[in-house]
Amino acid sequence: MKTKNFFTVMAAAAALFLSAALPSAASDTKVGTDGAAFMKIPTGSPRAQAMGNNGVSLAEGGEAMGINPAGIASAQMREVSYANMSWFQEYSGQYLSYVHPIGQSVVGINLGYYGIDGFDVRDSEGKPQYGADVKVRNGYTSLAIAKGFFLEKLLIGVSAKQVLEDNYTTEYKNLVFDLGVILRIGRKLSLGWAGQNFSGKKHQVVKVNRLGGAYAFNPFMTLALEQKTYSDRKGRLGGGVEFSLPEEVLQVGRVSVRAGYSPADNLGKNLDDKSLGSLGLSDISGWSFGVGLYSAQALGYGMGFDYTLAPYGSLGKASQLALRFQF
């Protein structure tokens, strides 16, 4: 039936949806040729997302598992974190993680789930199929272990990850692996590298390589630079900055303001989202902004809140909110 055939086409479109939405250079002819494009999204780390998706040398605790597994080695306490991510065209996701120090090592487990609500399905003539129950489900779960060496100057982590991509007509399941390293030089400079999604079937899970560094000029300002290379896209250099008022200054907690940039195409102007217009971001793409609050004293536990907003021109905006608790 032509309707069923068109569902197949729509499923393929869903598989490429994120690749189209994620910024890409026009000259990159391989963009979208690898699956599980949702693995490019820094779900679970609004901090890294706010700094232009640059966090390979900075990520710590549960947020590190989706960026650089070595980062969980810095955890001194047990930590639970939850994040809610909103992407384009009703695409959204949730993230949950838990890290636990054991002796000289730290283990962590996380779960990420993504889906599309109200997916627009039409037949070959373009007529809406309101009764069609088309679901697009993406997700992953991983188990990580990391350890610090030389008084926490060198952090090494590895994780095994099961990735699911269900595009209605086709379902892919892949076991992949991540490896990461963070090297801290003195108190101000840190370097990081992470390779993600290795050993998956060819082209079914996009592979990611991150290489970057961060420099803390003082307790108030940190600058990060990072080169990200995907198996279906050329590498790009991005950067981000974080301004913080330490807890020692405010007495009640640390407040951070963040901004970052990664090169992106001109995605046009958004005429529908009034919030972007009021902020002067309706024709901005590539930039991201965020805030963070953290207190080591709240109710006797460590508590953190992070929020990020990333405009993408005519496509709309992405946002992410995360909470974490340390005990």
Regions found by a protein language model. Give the residues of each.
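Cleavable N-terminal export/targeting peptides
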Residues: M1-F38
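Subset of outer-membrane beta-barrel
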Residues: S27-F327
